[in-house]
From Swiss-Prot:
Name of this protein: NAD(P)H-quinone oxidoreductase subunit K, chloroplastic
Tagged with keyword Glycoprotein: no
Localization per record: Plastid, Chloroplast thylakoid membrane
Entry membrane topology: Peripheral membrane protein
NCBIfam families (UniProt xref): nuoB_fam, PRK06411.1
Length: 207
C-alpha cells in the first residue's frame, strides 16, 4: 500500500483539485518573492567589509539566500553599511539610501557603524551611529562580526519581510531620519597625554 503525503495539502482549496493549485494572496506572494531575492548594495568602509566578502566564497555561499550584490542603488532593496561613517560621508550615504526604491532595508554591521566604535571617543568627525542618518532594520554588533552572524542577520531580515503587509511596504519612513551636523558634546584636549586628567584635577580643586 503506497501512501503519498503532500505537505501542501492544507493550501489546496478542495481535496479533488489538482495539487498544482495553491491558494495564497498577493501580499504573501510579494513577500515570498522579495525575501527570496534580496539585492544588497554593499557600503563597506572598513575592516568589517572583509568579513562580508568571505560570504561570497564557496564555504558560506550566500547565493543560496538569493543575495545578488548590486553596484547601483536604483537596483538594490538592501544596503549593508560596514565600517566607520564620517560626517563628510553622511550626505553621500543618505543620497544612496534615498535613491533606493521602496521597500528598502538597512543592516548596520559592526560596532563602528552602530555606535561609532573606538573612533567615537576622541574624534570630531565620526557619526555616532548610522541610525542618526538612515533608519536601521537589523543591528549586527561585533568587531568585526563573523560570517555566521551575517547569515543570521540576513535570515532575521527575511523573517521580517515575510511578516510585512502591503500597507507597511507603502508607508513612508523618511520621518525616522535624524540627520544633524550638531552633535551635543564638548571638545577636550587629547586624553592620551595625561593633560586632560590634570585639568580635571585642577577644576575639582578650584571648586
Amino acid at each position: 500500500m503506497n501512501i503519498t503525503i503532500n505537505p501542501m495539502e492544507s493550501l489546496v482549496s478542495k481535496p479533488n483539485t489538482s495539487n498544482s493549485i495553491i491558494l495564497t494572496n498577493l501580499n504573501d506572494f510579494s513577500n515570498w518573492a522579495r525575501l527570496s531575492s534580496l539585492w544588497p548594495l554593499l557600503y563597506g568602509t572598513s575592516c568589517c567589509f572583509i568579513e562580508f566578502a568571505s560570504l561570497i566564497g564557496s564555504r558560506f555561499d550566500f547565493d543560496r539566500y538569493g543575495l545578488v550584490p548590486r553596484s547601483s542603488p536604483r537596483q538594490a532593496d538592501l544596503i549593508i553599511t560596514a565600517g566607520t561613517v564620517t560626517m563628510k560621508m553622511a550626505p553621500s550615504l543618505i543620497r544612496l539610501y534615498e535613491q533606493m526604491p521602496e521597500p528598502k532595508y538597512v543592516i548596520a554591521m559592526g560596532a563602528c557603524t552602530i555606535t561609532g566604535g573606538m573612533f567615537s571617543t576622541d574624534s570630531y568627525s565620526t557619526v555616532r551611529g548610522v541610525d542618526k542618518l538612515i533608519p536601521v532594520d537589523i543591528y549586527l554588533p561585533g568587531c568585526p562580526p563573523k560570517p555566521e552572524a551575517i547569515i543570521d542577520a540576513v535570515i532575521k531580515l527575511r523573517k521580517k519581510v515575510a511578516q510585512e503587509t502591503y500597507k507597511d511596504q507603502k508607508r513612508s519612513i523618511r520621518g525616522n531620519r535624524f540627520f544633524t551636523l550638531k552633535h551635543q558634546f564638548d571638545f577636550v584636549p587629547s586624553i592620551h597625554t595625561g593633560q586632560y586628567t590634570q585639568q580635571l584635577h585642577d577644576k575639582s580643586l578650584s571648586k
